[in-house]
A protein has these predicted regions:
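Structural motif
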Residues: 36-37, 83-84, 107-109, 142-144, ...
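Short beta-strand/turn micro-motifs composed of small residues
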Residues: 39-40, 89, 112, 146
């Protein structure tokens, strides 16, 4: 029999106050590294200093804006090629570490400080280069450690963006299937199923739930599974359709007016459902959910 082999995260930990147990989590999974380098922002370092002081890092590197050039600049300071990179931050920091790890062929894990998009486990990094947001293919992380209590402290706007990014999988899957019917593009039913299931995982929740541990856990797991769908498809297709193209166009054409990726994607999702998916669409259902 024939099987498809894919890389899946060795570590997936979602829980309260688990970041301080990073070393124990690595040992429990038989992962041993001589050194670890933390990549984060100065703001997060200062905010979570008491927790970070309980962990041992060979060095701490700081990311400000998360541009392509900044990622290369920070990357060039890494001389030890046998370290584990720990990306602690939002999408910009995680995407910068993805590029660094991919270029240097280093192993990395993600520790999201918020859940604004699927950066925590997608094989794609979106970075500002030459004045425009660009996508770069990268390897997925070795693992994800989502500390619910840290994520709870992030602005609600970021969490809502994460919901928008995840729910938009429904639109992406429709576009992928349309390309299959209309253009003969190959599809992966397993990847489509993962993308759909992960997108549906947050539908039962309301705005009042966004600080709850259960919601944070389901959002984190959903974003990871969405990333896994992309890894399985070897493409962003399961989680990126017309709604993402609209968001990318906003970034390209109106860089000074663009906002969070997940919020733009949610708006694009509504636009596509309302104006292009006829005669049947999910526009009314989406409006009720987003309201």
């Amino acid at each position: 029999m024939y099987y498809k082999t894919i890389n899946v995260p060795i570590v997936l930990e979602v829980g309260e106050d688990i970041f301080v147990h990073l070393d124990d989590i690595l040992k429990e999974n038989h992962l041993y590294f001589k050194e670890k380098i933390l990549v984060t922002s100065m703001e997060l370092r200062d905010l979570y200093k008491s927790r970070l002081d309980k962990l041992s890092f060979e060095d701490i590197l700081f990311i400000k804006g998360g541009s392509y050039d900044e990622a290369l600049e920070v990357m060039n300071t890494i001389t030890n090629k046998e370290v584990l990179l720990v990306a602690f931050g939002g999408g910009s920091i995680i995407d910068a570490v993805k590029l660094m790890a991919n270029t240097l062929d280093l192993t990395y894990i993600t520790v999201p400080s918020t859940l604004s998009n699927d950066a925590i486990y997608s094989p794609i990094a979106r970075l500002l280069k030459d004045g425009k947001k660009q996508s770069f293919g990268v390897k997925a992380p070795l693992g994800i450690i989502a500390d619910v209590n840290i994520i709870k402290g992030s602005p609600e706007k970021l969490l809502l963006a994460g919901v928008g990014d995840l729910v938009s999988n429904a639109s992406a899957v429709k576009d992928w299937y349309l390309a299959h019917i209309d253009k003969g593009e190959s599809i992966n039913n397993f990847a489509m199923a993962l993308a759909s299931l992960s997108g549906n995982s947050v539908i039962p929740y309301t705005f009042n739930d966004i600080r709850s541990s259960r919601f944070i856990g389901d959002l984190a797991n959903g974003l990871v599974i969405s990333g896994l769908a992309m890894v399985l498809a070897n493409s962003s297709r399961p989680a990126s359709g017309a709604e993402h193209m609209i968001s990318h166009a906003i970034d390209d054409l109106f860089p000074n007016r663009s906002t969070l990726h997940g919020l733009q994607v949610a708006w694009g999702h509504l636009l596509v459902e309302r104006d292009f998916r006829k005669p049947e669409n999910d526009y009314e259902k989406l409006m009720i959910f987003f309201e």
